[in-house]
Amino acid sequence: MSGVNDIRSAFLDFFKKNGHEVVASGPLVPRNDPTLMFTNAGMVQFKNVFTGMETRPYNRATTAQKCVRAGGKHNDLDNVGYTARHHTFFEMLGNFSFGDYFKDVAIELAWNLVTKEFGLDPKRLLVTVYHTDDEAAGHWRKIAGLPEERIIRIPTSDNFWAMGDTGPCGPCSEIFFDHGEGIPGGPPGSPDEDGDRFIEIWNLVFMQYEQVSPDERINLPRPSIDTGMGLERVAAVLQGVHDNYEIDLFKALIHATEEAVGVRAEGERRPSYKVIADHLRASSFLIADGVLPSNEGRGYVLRRIMRRAMRHAQLLGAEEPLMWRLVPALVREMGQAYPELVRGEALITETLKLEETRFRKTLARGLNLLSDATGGMGEGDRLDGETAFKLYDTYGFPLDLTQDALRQRGVTVDLEGFNAAMERQKAEARASWAGSGEAATEAVWFSVKDRTGATDFLGYETEEAEGIIAALVKDGAMVETAAEGEEVAVVTNQTPFYGESGGQVGDTGTIEGEGFAIEIKNTQKKGEGLFVHFGQVKKGTVRISEPVSLRVDHERRTRIRANHSATHLLHEALREVLGTHVAQKGSLVAPDRLRFDFSHPKPIAEEELQQIEDLANEVVLQNAPVVTRLMAVDDAIAEGAMALFGEKYGDEVRVVSMGKGTQGEKSGKTYSLELCGGTHVNATGDIGLVHIIGEGAVAAGVRRVEALTGAAARRYLDEQERRLKAAASVLKVSPGDLLPRLETLVEERRKLERELSEARKKLALGGGAGAKAGEEREEVGGVGFIGRVVEGISPKDLKPLADEGKKSLGSGVVVFVGTSEEGKASVVVGVTDDLTGRFSAVDLVRKASAAIGGQGGGGRPDMAQAGGPDAANAAAAVEAVRAALAG
């Protein structure tokens, strides 16, 4: 029972037998909790239950919760690899009581599990309690039979837990395992407590108080229990090892890395293997939960983790991207417990491969810069902040990666200098933006909401309604009236107008009253439930408290509805064709088009796009009813409804279902089932037709499809057909023969371009037929020299030309200046290897570049290239090189 998977199962089974509901792990990105970057403890998904804001159909629960501690307040990233127990990703086993049992039962359950189920020797266990918690100490004596010397009272906050400055709180009791006298370290509370002998394996939190103010704490009416046991730690204890990275799970991941790299995980290399194994888990689980590498927020933390592992892969000698090759080993070890790894394996693999391929392009150059900057440094020295910032800004090195690279040499980074450089860049960015006053403008809506309350939205049932003008806003301030011709924002007590949200654009239409009319150009949601109509007064004077008639533009709303329903069909079709890793990352639902952004690591093949379009249109042709139901959010998710990752949902949600599947697992089942607050067609046939018009990348790991529906799709296809026939007519072939004819013409053009390029090269190397470059040779300053201006040659052809020139010279310098019809010039300088000690092609090309108005140039000592806007001075560029040689 000592394998990680066995331990996890034994823990959950034990508490299930003791009346606990086994609850699946929450996602790593907490739902509806902006205070946390990542889930970092088992109680996170129960936070609202503990505070009384949410109820569950059970009052006892147990979980194996995936957690990440990297970035923000809880950050173990810097220590991973160099200690026995630090992780960025770990599993927290826990049991919870929501007002059911309390200290005595919690202690009895914990003691029975560790001593009877896990079989740990009671003589090697000791516990801590908060120094005033006599009740807990008494239970440990009575239930576990522990003597007083093995019940250690701790007066610090280590043994008192609080959710925040206010809210539930209470004392803790921790269970420690004694590894024995051969391991250095003292018991908890002693000066040597940070040693490895006594290891905490379980923390029991007794939530019995509520902190109502800094000076006031009251008893909770229903005390609760929250416990947390680190799976990796207890596995190390049960497997008889002192390092978490020696348990079976990490052994498998490290072995897979050894096989991929071909080097044993020994000595100084061992920390790199630990880093890779840990960061592989963190990266893979974050990607599976919808986080993708980016330059901000959670995505940047993921990128930092990935790039730190990638540097350690490079230290081990990996010459190709490594991380993606280890994913199958991780899925084998953890996929059964966490099926999201299996579902997301393709996305995880491609994302890791793409990120490492990109980073490797700058990794070597960044490490060279770091080496040059710290070449003479040793213990106690500091790298200047400007260089650290350059590594971050230019080469993509997160600060902690630079710190990690310098760690073993004892070199630190000037953090003040780094932060100053970062702030300077931000200040420059802010200065380049004049500002729009949006913050001040947005503040008015809080005042409006206080005055009017939320708007009653009627738009699911009707497109016309009567209402009362509750507020008018002009130029960021509330007003009593608005005159003809003025732009105004209108808030009514109720409205059929949909406010822009969830990717769907806001409605347009009219608001009319006695003697006035307003053309509504957009509708937006402001804050919680305030619908704001933006428009222009077309007639009369508008006043608050006036009764009005509100009419949505029916034809426009109809097209929006069709496009919104089509996005649902495309979403499901994308998942069916590409895989279940596809998750919505954004959308636009407009009257004239739709676009859908989703997680996928690579371009979609044409045949896959056709499959996706065909699947969506199959459901359109079913003319199936589109059904909307109001459901409890948990019931909707349990039924299989797709939710937008990270979106905040209330207790009750709208669930939109449409169509029947015809293939695979979907056959005979509801085709599309999503949580959605938008407006939709009554039946799928109302969509008419779905046609994909584009696919491309939005960001790393995020793709976008664009599509048209109904009449817009038909007009688009009609126009495409018209153009096809016109093109066929120009080439005097039938539309069916157009493609082979075009392929023939393209190949003929390529052949002519190659022949023209060769002719220009020959001309550049010496003129007419039979001429040789050697015939153009000069002696300048005792050095062989060829210099020519070549009209109409592309910059990419100059380098091969210079190679030919160098070859024909044997020893010497060549310069070729190409000119274009646009009046621009390109120059290349080549220096044979025997002369690079005397002449640098880079120095020479910069002299030539100056003559044609260029700003320098670059390359190697034997070959360099530059450009400039002044082709009229091409000959002067040649002369500049000639003069430099003549010296």
UniProtKB/Swiss-Prot annotation:
Location of this chain's protein in the cell: Cytoplasm
Cofactor note: Binds 1 zinc ion per subunit.
Gene3D superfamilies hit by this protein: 2.40.30.130, 3.10.310.40, 3.30.54.20, 6.10.250.550, Bira Bifunctional Protein, Domain 2 (3.30.930.10), Threonyl-trna Synthetase, Chain A, domain 2 (3.30.980.10)
Alphabetical keyword list: Aminoacyl-tRNA synthetase, ATP-binding, Cytoplasm, Ligase, Metal-binding, Nucleotide-binding, Protein biosynthesis, RNA-binding, tRNA-binding, Zinc
Catalytic activity: tRNA(Ala) + L-alanine + ATP = L-alanyl-tRNA(Ala) + AMP + diphosphate
InterPro entries found in the cross-reference section: aa-tRNA-synth_II/BPL/LPL, Ala-tRNA-lgiase_IIc, Ala-tRNA-ligase_IIc_anticod-bd, Ala-tRNA-synth_IIc_core, Ala-tRNA-synth_IIc_N, Ala-tRNA_ligase, Ala_tRNA_ligase_euk/bac, DHHA1_dom
Binding site residues for Zn(2+): 564, 568, 676, 680
Chief place where the protein resides: cytoplasm
EC numbers for this chain: 6.1.1.7
GO aspect biological process, one term: alanyl-tRNA aminoacylation
A GO cellular-component term linked to this record: cytosol
Keyword Membrane tagged: no
CC cofactor: Zn(2+)
Pfam families: DHHA1, tRNA-synt_2c, tRNA_SAD
GO MF annotation, one: ATP binding
Family recorded in the similarity comment: Belongs to the class-II aminoacyl-tRNA synthetase family.
Domain notes: Consists of three domains; the N-terminal catalytic domain, the editing domain and the C-terminal C-Ala domain. The editing domain removes incorrectly charged amino acids, while the C-Ala domain, along with tRNA(Ala), serves as a bridge to cooperatively bring together the editing and aminoacylation centers thus stimulating deacylation of misacylated tRNAs.
UniProt-listed PANTHER family: ALANINE--TRNA LIGASE, CYTOPLASMIC, ALANYL-TRNA SYNTHETASE
Role of this protein: Catalyzes the attachment of alanine to tRNA(Ala) in a two-step reaction: alanine is first activated by ATP to form Ala-AMP and then transferred to the acceptor end of tRNA(Ala). Also edits incorrectly charged Ser-tRNA(Ala) and Gly-tRNA(Ala) via its editing domain.
NCBIfam families in alphabetical order: alaS
Protein name: Alanine--tRNA ligase
Species assigned in the record: Chelativorans sp. (strain BNC1)
